[in-house]
Amino acid sequence: DHEQLLWNKGYNHCYILKDKMSEEMLEAASLYEPVTGRKMTVMTDLPAVLLYTAGYYDRPDTAICLETQFYPDTPSHSDFPSCLVLPEKAYEHCTLFSFQVQKEK
């Protein structure tokens, strides 16, 4: 019943992982389903991850999306990690989605 969850009809939130760019891969998120033991882990070198639960669709809360990205509105904020793409420099970032079955302990 949190105000932001009601207003957005679920999650539509950007979570900051780091405050400056580096090649370091960080765990952005993990999802676990205890009945089957399925687990998904998201690793990235990008500075943020967006969590979205599709609240505006016909059947809200039937999906979840984890999008690695730069901070929202980055070009308007000089203190945010730069998302500028230049023709002389290759754009290289990495996001890894790994899946496993984890038995309960």
Residues covered by each model-derived region:
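Active-site pocket scaffolds in enzymes
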Residues: 1-105
